[in-house]
Regions:
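Catalytic machinery of carbohydrate-active enzymes
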Residues: 1-249
Length: 249
């Protein structure tokens, strides 16, 4: 930490604004729970997308406020009304999308914190009064951890993710997992096809993992594009990986 921390004592309440997508929300969860471990008495409120809400449901000590982007201005207004009596010590706007910046206008917080110059996009800087320092490493998680660092939370030796997973879900997942060796789960599709990695490279990674006696599992949503992507990859594999595409949530 090369700057003075924003808080030298635990804040009473923080609001996290990260709506989507599932992968980014997973990274944000590690940061939120890291803050939670350091400041267990701080009230944490997380505004999250309706779809991503299903992933986070059941996590302890965090108030989840869902927002459906399909609800338009009515949804934004309803969100503002729901939070109108909340005065947060800080808002962590961890999403650069213009929609998130608009939502932030109706959130009452002394400090509204956004990304640094390198990562800020879509005019986010207009809607914040504090900006984190850009990390030297480019990974999404590093960008999110910069928010915890800016608040005054010490770095974590090792981050952890704790999701509320039901016993039935754990039992269902056992059919895909080999408990006698390491398991590699590959989810090759992003929300947009243009963001996807090359089919040949996924197959190459899978083949290398298999050569090291790793159980390779492919997963995806039931969407046609994603099922076809997995089919193309597995066709290039030198072995038969576990195909869980369209079978998990």
């Amino acid at each position: 930490m090369s700057h003075s921390p924003l808080f030298t004592s635990p804040p009473k309440s923080l609001c996290i604004l990260r709506l989507s997508a599932v992968g980014d929300v997973c990274h944000a969860l590690a940061v939120v729970q890291h803050i939670q471990r350091h400041w267990p008495q701080t009230k944490l409120t997380w505004i999250v997308g309706k779809t991503e809400m299903g992933l986070l449901s059941g996590i302890e000590g965090v108030e989840l406020v869902p927002y459906d982007k399909k609800s338009g201005w009515k949804g934004v207004w309803n969100l503002w009304m729901f939070l109108k009596n909340n005065q947060f010590d800080a808002l962590l706007n961890m999403q650069t999308a213009f929609r998130a910046s608009i939502i932030s206008l109706g959130i009452q917080a002394k400090y509204k914190i956004g990304f640094g110059k390198k990562r800020s996009r879509e005019g986010q800087w207009v809607f914040v009064n504090r900006r984190v320092q850009d990390p030297e490493t480019p990974h999404v998680l590093d960008g999110f951890m910069a928010f915890a660092d800016y608040l005054g939370v010490p770095p974590a030796e090792m981050l952890s993710w704790h999701l509320a997973i039901s016993d039935s879900d754990r039992e269902y997942a056992k059919q895909f997992i080999d408990p006698t060796r390491k398991n590699l789960i590959i989810s090759p599709c992003s929300s947009k096809a243009e963001k996807d990695w090359l089919v040949e490279r996924y197959a190459e990674v899978a083949n290398i993992a298999h050569q090291h006696n790793v159980n390779v599992i492919f997963c995806s949503s039931p969407a046609k594009r994603e099922l076809e992507m997995v089919k193309k990859i597995t066709a290039l594999c030198d072995f038969q990986p576990v195909d869980a595409s369209g079978k998990t949530s």
